[in-house]
């Protein structure tokens, strides 16, 4: 009975003609294509980034050439105040969700005023760039009209122009100590923590006959700073190259060495004046992942307890293996008196040196890190070269922190050799 009832139903089915099947498939594909296209469109719109450069005047400031020096105390102080004003203005505005970043790029002193050149980044989910530019300009104009506080700004001097991503990156990369890419955490070199690409763009590898030998810091288009003892084996430029990036091999953006300038008072086998400059045959083309660190002013102070970061491809433990990828360590500057104590280095730390790490040990620079950078960010998150990895007793030992050449002590010497 059940079978006989089902048979007529089965027998009554009709197959669709091939043209109808093809038409149906094409219709489904068209709908899928439309959905995918809309998704791609809205995702692209959502991620649309706009870059701007501009300028405005700060009035009633006596002429001072120090405002032109990007590392001077005067320049950083005024830039910090203006950057805070911009952040407050945008974050309290109706486009705070579109706001990404704003920075003072340069200050140009004039008679009784300073022109501030600015750099801005925004996103706009609706891709209405002209409307966005007008709103940004309006917020900046209102900010400049509000002259509360010690500064007097001129709203009539405001200029704002949209620029390309390429030009925006070029502006930032030509300034010292800026990091387009950042990591939220720092760990140790001894023990291992890998740096991100572009996180430490001034870090370089000094190579002898193609093999990593020491670290170095890019301080100018053709100049790097390193340790003098890195040239005990050879200082013949023909045997030396410099490369950048996070991988120690293969070489990335390799450059040849024209000259090695070793401090005149350095003595082989001793630790004082362990400083050298590398001059390259050609200029380094700055980019997001390769550009220079800031040099501190000779008068700049980095007190004990200040947080610093050391980077390099040195051994992960004493006489241990060396990493393929760049390592980083977050450490602290140690009081010189504590470092000169009998249980530590017994008076061997000179005024031109500084100790950094922890008296408890463990986190430290190690073999192969020599010549590399010890850096510190200022309140504007601009990074300065505080020290040069020089010497220590093994790696990560209790009461034996790393010892670095104090860059401020050699600031005049560096300027005399490089013009920087």
Curated annotation (Swiss-Prot):
The processes (GO biological process) annotated in the record are: proteolysis
State the annotated membrane topology for this chain. Single-pass type II membrane protein
Disulfide bond positions: 214-230, 339-355, 366-395
Q: List membrane-spanning regions.
A: 20-40
Q: Which residues are glycosylated?
A: 111, 146, 239
For molecular function, the Gene Ontology terms on record are:
serine-type endopeptidase activity; serine-type peptidase activity
Which segments does the topology annotation call Cytoplasmic?
A: 1-19
Q: Which residues form the Peptidase S1 domain?
A: 189-419
Q: Which residues lie on this side of the membrane: Extracellular?
A: 41-420
Location(s) in or outside the cell = Membrane; Cell membrane
Q: Which GO terms describe its cellular component?
A: extracellular region; plasma membrane
> Where is this protein chiefly located?
membrane
Q: Does the keyword Membrane apply?
A: yes
Q: Where is the active site?
A: 229 (charge relay system), 274 (charge relay system), 370 (charge relay system)
Q: What is the activity regulation comment for this entry?
A: Inhibited by aprotinin, leupeptin, benzamidine, SERPINA1, SPINT1 and SPINT2.
Domain (SEA) ranges:
48-165
Against Pfam families, the record matches this protein to: SEA (PF01390), Trypsin (PF00089)
EC number(s) recorded for this UniProt protein:
3.4.21.-
Q: Which Gene3D superfamilies match?
A: SEA domain, Trypsin-like serine proteases
State the UniProt keywords alphabetically: Cell membrane, Disulfide bond, Glycoprotein, Hydrolase, Membrane, Protease, Serine protease, Signal-anchor, Transmembrane, Transmembrane helix
**Could you tell me which InterPro entries the record lists for this protein?**
Pept_S1A_HAT/DESC1, Peptidase_S1_PA, Peptidase_S1_PA_chymotrypsin, Peptidase_S1A, SEA_dom, SEA_dom_sf, Trypsin_dom, TRYPSIN_HIS
The record's function comment reads: Serine protease.
Annotated family? Belongs to the peptidase S1 family.
Name recorded for this polypeptide: Transmembrane protease serine 11B-like protein
């Amino acid at each position: 009975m059940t079978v006989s009832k089902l048979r007529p139903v089965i027998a009554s089915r009709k197959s669709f003609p091939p043209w109808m099947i093809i038409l149906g498939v094409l219709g489904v594909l068209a709908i899928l294509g439309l959905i995918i296209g809309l998704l791609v469109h809205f995702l692209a719109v959502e991620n649309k980034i706009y870059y701007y450069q501009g300028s405005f005047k700060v009035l009633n400031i006596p002429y001072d050439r120090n405002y032109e020096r990007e590392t001077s105390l005067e320049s950083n102080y005024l830039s910090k105040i203006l950057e805070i004003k911009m952040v407050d203005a945008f974050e309290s505005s109706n486009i705070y969700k579109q706001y990404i970043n704003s920075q003072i790029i340069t200050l140009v002193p004039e008679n009784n005023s300073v022109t501030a050149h600015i750099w801005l980044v925004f996103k706009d989910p609706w891709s209405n760039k002209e409307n966005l530019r007008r709103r940004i300009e309006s917020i900046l104009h209102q900010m400049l009209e509000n002259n509360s506080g010690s500064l007097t700004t001129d709203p009539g001097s405001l200029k704002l122009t949209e620029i390309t991503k390429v030009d925006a990156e070029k502006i930032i990369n030509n300034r010292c100590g800026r990091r387009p890419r950042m990591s939220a955490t720092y760990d140790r070199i001894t023990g291992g923590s890998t740096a991100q690409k572009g996180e430490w763009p001034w870090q370089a590898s000094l190579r002898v006959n193609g093999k990593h030998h020491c670290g170095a810091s890019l301080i100018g288009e053709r100049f790097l700073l390193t340790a003098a003892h890195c040239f005990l084996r050879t200082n013949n430029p023909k045997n030396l190259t410099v490369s950048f990036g996070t991988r120690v091999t293969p070489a990335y953006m390799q450059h040849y060495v024209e000259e090695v300038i070793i401090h005149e008072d350095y003595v082989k086998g001793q630790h004082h004046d362990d400083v050298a400059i590398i001059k390259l045959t050609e200029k380094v083309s700055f980019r997001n992942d390769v550009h220079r660190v800031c040099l501190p002013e000779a008068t700049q102070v980095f007190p004990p307890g200040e947080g610093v970061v050391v980077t390099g491809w040195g051994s992960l433990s004493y006489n241990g293996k060396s990493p393929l990828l760049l390592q980083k360590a977050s450490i602290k500057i140690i009081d010189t008196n504590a470092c000169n104590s009998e249980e530590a280095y017994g008076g061997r730390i000179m005024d031109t040196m500084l100790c950094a790490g922890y008296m408890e040990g463990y986190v430290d620079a190690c073999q192969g890190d020599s010549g590399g950078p010890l850096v510190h960010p200022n309140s504007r998150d601009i990074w300065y070269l505080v020290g040069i990895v020089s010497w220590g007793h093994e790696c990560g030992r209790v009461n034996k922190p790393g010892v670095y050449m104090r860059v401020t002590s050699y600031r005049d010497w560096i300027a005399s050799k490089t013009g920087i």
